[in-house]
């Protein structure tokens, strides 16, 4: 009976996938399951086997073995037990990828507690809101970040310093896991603004099984891959697809710690001989705009991205630099990955710019507001059929004649001007094709005549003036249509972004909402 990892081909996946086969990858079952055991302990029999390689922004390389994490996480589980922190209680971890981070995250899950990774660049307000929401018993962080977390009632702030490691060293390296598959394992916060905190997405230990869909068909992980994901493990991509999925399959994963530098990333990709790369769209754009990619030699055979669509110029850069297609992996934190491009599949044609096709076993449709399926090429909302009902993603899309899905922006990124419906994503994609545009964001702003008009925010090294603004308007109008272009153009030094690196159009809309509508 073939295993799902025996081939990356699309036809093989369609012919051999069955949901029950996902359980073949794990020691646990539907009753008893523990993520820490599945990702770490069962792979730790070889003391030298590397679990994670961390490329630090300062140039350091850190290699952590499965045995290192197994021992330290067991000690951390004992450390929690000594403090009276029991199953179901939350343990917040505000650390960059490091031995300490993995020890704490997997140790909390061994204990049966709930691990809560927090982004290390949160300020006091961002930390306070999330801590107030999840109510952890302890928050583990660095000395530099301890002040941001101090003074929160009911939370013990602990610094992961030499004294902490010395205390752990006195504790046993064995721990018997006793969690059920449906016990809570992780809280993960999406990358919203601190003023509008998204609810934590809560994952049980069973979630590691469903995650294999994305691992097998979204990132294309197979035994023997040398994997890398630079996204922070505080976010869904870095946590699920960059950490848990490869480790569960026993694959060494690489990651990035510290302030992001695209040149440092490319250096790590070359030195680690990475064969499978999964990153956010922003990471690829930054590699392109660095102008330094030509200095490196890569060994990548599978490449995927997520977070937001990639513009055409960056797709061309990926093809020229890595020599493999950029495979979109689409989903949301709430529903998981649902549309993929099957990296490594010789029999699957990747359509540049498309979201691909559904993962095996999932039913995905683009629907009108009344719930009926859209015709080919018609824009509607992407929905997933789960547990007897259609689950909305709040993303717009369309399906072409060949069954490929295409993204058309968030539902709130649609701009309706004088009755015309326009996509912010399409306008941004065209603007980014201009050689003098480094970054672009498009939103709808109030207009007394048209209801809304498109306003583009541009980051460019070129001097900003009216002539450049008109050039961009004409550039867009000639490539899209006579009505689909930015009637307003603003130049800015930088665009607001979410902590996950996505352009935060909501902040731009909020700022514009305070201005009175104008005629154009």
Predicted regions: what they are:
Residues 122-125, 129, 139-141, 277, ...:
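AMP-binding/adenylate-forming catalytic core of the ANL superfamily
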Residues 48-106, 123-128, 204-206:
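Conserved AMP-binding/adenylate-forming core of the ANL superfamily
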Residues 58-59, 138, 144-182:
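ANL superfamily adenylate-forming
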Residues 274-279, 288-349, 363:
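Gly/Ser/Thr-rich phosphate-binding loop
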Residues 62-67, 185-210, 336:
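Conserved AMP-binding A3 loop
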Residues 1-64, 68-81, 144, 154, ...:
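N-lobe entry segment of adenylate-forming
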Residues 209-229, 234-275, 290:
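Conserved AMP-binding/adenylation subdomain of ANL enzymes
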Residues 48-50, 171-192, 196-197, 220-226:
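Conserved pre-ATP/AMP-binding loop-to-beta segment of ANL
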């Amino acid at each position: 009976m073939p295993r799902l990892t025996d081939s990356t081909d699309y036809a093989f996946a369609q012919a051999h996938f069955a949901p029950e086969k996902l359980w073949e990858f794990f020691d646990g079952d539907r009753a008893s399951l523990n993520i820490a055991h599945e990702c770490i302990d069962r792979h730790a029999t070889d003391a030298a086997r590397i679990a994670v390689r961390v490329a630090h922004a300062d140039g350091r390389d850190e290699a952590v073995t499965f045995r290192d994490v197994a021992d330290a996480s067991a000690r951390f589980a004992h450390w929690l037990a000594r403090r009276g922190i029991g199953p179901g209680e939350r343990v917040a971890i505000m650390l960059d990828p490091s031995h300490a981070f993995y020890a704490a995250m997997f140790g909390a899950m061994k204990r049966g507690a709930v691990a809560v990774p927090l982004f290390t660049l949160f300020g006091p307000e961002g930390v306070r809101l999330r801590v107030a929401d999840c109510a952890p018993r302890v928050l583990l962080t660095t000395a530099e970040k301890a002040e941001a977390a101090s003074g929160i009632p009911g939370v013990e702030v602990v610094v992961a310093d030499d004294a902490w490691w010395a205390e752990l060293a006195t504790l046993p390296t064995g721990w018997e896991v006793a969690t059920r598959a449906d016990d809570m394992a992780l809280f993960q916060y999406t990358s919203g603004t601190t003023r509008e905190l998204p609810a934590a997405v809560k994952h049980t230990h069973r979630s590691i099984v469903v995650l294999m869909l994305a691992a097998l068909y979204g990132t294309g992980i197979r035994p023997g891959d040398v994997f890398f994901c630079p996204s922070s493990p505080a976010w869904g991509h870095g946590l699920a697809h960059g950490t848990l999925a490869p480790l569960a399959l026993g694959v060494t994963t690489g990651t990035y710690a510290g302030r992001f530098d695209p040149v440092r990333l490319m250096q790590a990709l070359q030195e680690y001989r990475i064969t499978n790369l999964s990153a956010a769209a922003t990471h690829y754009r930054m590699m392109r705009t660095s102008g330094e990619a030509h200095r490196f030699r890569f060994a990548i055979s599978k490449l995927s991205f997520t977070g937001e669509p990639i513009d055409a110029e960056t797709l061309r850069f990926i093809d020229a630099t890595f020599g493999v297609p950029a495979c979109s992996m689409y989903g949301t934190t709430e529903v998981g990955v649902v549309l993929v491009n099957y990296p490594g599949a010789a029999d699957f044609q990747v359509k540049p710019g498309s979201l691909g096709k559904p993962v095996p076993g999932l039913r995905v449709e683009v629907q009108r507001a009344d719930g009926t399926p859209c015709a080919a090429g018609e824009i509607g909302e992407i929905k997933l059929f789960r547990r007897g009902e259609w689950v909305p993603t709040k993303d717009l899309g369309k399906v072409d004649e060949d069954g490929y899905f295409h993204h058309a922006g968030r539902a709130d990124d649609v701009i309706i001007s004088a009755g015309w419906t326009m996509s912010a994503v399409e306008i941004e994609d065209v603007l980014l094709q201009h050689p003098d545009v480094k970054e672009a964001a498009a939103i709808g702003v109030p207009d007394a005549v048209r209801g809304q008009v498109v306003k583009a925010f541009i980051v460019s090294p070129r001097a900003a003036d009216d002539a450049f603004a008109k050039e961009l308007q004409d550039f867009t109008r000639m490539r899209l249509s006579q009505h689909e272009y930015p009637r307003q153009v603003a130049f800015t030094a930088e665009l607001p972004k979410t902590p996950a690196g996505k352009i935060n159009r909501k902040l731009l809309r909020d700022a514009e909402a305070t201005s009175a509508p104008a005629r154009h």
